[in-house]
Amino acid sequence: MGQLHFITKLLDIKDTNIQIIDVVNRDSHKEIIAKLDYDAPSCPDCGSLMKKYDFQKPSKIPYLETTGMPSRILLRKRRFKCYHCSKMMVAETPLVKKNHQIPRIINQKIAQKLIEKISMTDIAHQLAISTSTVIRKLNDFHFEHDFSRLPKIMSWDEYAFTKGKMSFIAQDFDNLNIITVLEGRTQAVIRNHFLRYDRAVRCQVKIITMDMFSPYYDLAKQLFPCAKIVLDRFHIIQHLSRAMSRFRVQIMNQFERKSHEYKAIKRYWKLIQQDSRKLSDKRFYRPTFRMHLTNKEILDKILSYSEDLKHHYQIYQLLLFHFQNKDPEKFFGLIEDNLKQVHPLFQTVFKTFLKNKEKIVNALQLHYSNAKLEATNNLIKLIKRNGFGFRNFENFKKRIFIALNIKKERTKFVLSQA
């Protein structure tokens, strides 16, 4: 009996009316045989004292794993009968709600598991319950928007919810809490949401970081008149890099496909894209050139094949240098000086930069970026991938808020050294 008492404590069963009778090891799980019994209460209908009648058929209550195996409690509940009005009543316990089969501790565990980036099917499998039970627990979560405040620094981005459809997300830059997740990213959807905030609240926003997505620019200015727009530095460099890559392909296609020049430009394309200050000076044997060369020597040979390629490469590297040094005057000065001389691929990018000069200057002068929100988007993609996609946007939205806005406390175990 002493061992069974400790089993009760180990399982965290605090109801003293539950008595564990035996523990049976099955092939796939453990069965904890128990009974619920206490003194007869008064009849809820007539007030007479009820009497003990018999025990119900055992309720199969799923429980947490013990020693790495799924467990369930076979709980026989006492039934009471009023011999005055024939009222029947079943004994109740705080272990599980009345007329329910899932215990409270399992519901708590479901809530904890929903914070993790795993699918609801996996949660159901781990806890030996149905997926429908997990979804019902997910639906118990309700997140209400606080329309009385907005953060001073906000990040905007989009992510793919379904194939061919992008959704909008806004995040607090400082504490990383999700402000909102909207099913669409159209101006009407975003405007309708943020107009629910008072103008005084919207004027509290001072900085908005975002990608180079032009429909956001005017919308952000209309909704947040006091906010500065800061473009993400990664996407600015990405525009430059893509222009350089496309121009390199055009130069490469001017040579015969079997020529040495074509093969060299095609094979060592990364050296052209890379920051010249980060080129390795280690010498290796290069089969394309049949000699030992450093990356710098390979690059010099490739640039010697075309004066146009060399000229645009030098402009590209100077722009990278001024951008990384955060010198907007020299960066835009170089763009304005070479706007008419460069290839149309570069002209398109340069005109885009000049059109958004103020926002790019903000990106160079301020340390804010969209990096934190991009990391959040990776977690959202992980949730979506682990769940093999979501058909219901509201369920997906709740998983995002639960996983990213609810902070999970960590217990650190310190292992003693022998």
Model-found features: residue ranges?
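Short secondary-structure boundary/capping segments
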Residues: 170-171, 223-227, 244-249
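Active-site beta-loop-alpha junctions of metal-dependent nucleic acid enzymes
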Residues: 99-101, 179-201, 207
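Short, positively charged, Gly/Tyr-enriched micro-motifs
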Residues: 47, 60-154, 158-165, 202-205, ...
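Short alpha-helix plus adjacent loop in nuclease-associated cores
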Residues: 236-257
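Short, conserved DNA-binding cores of transcription-related domains
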Residues: 1-87, 91-93
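Acidic, glycine-enriched active-site microenvironments
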Residues: 99-110, 121, 180, 321-324, ...
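Acidic/histidine-rich catalytic cores and adjacent linkers
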Residues: 40, 45, 51, 138, ...
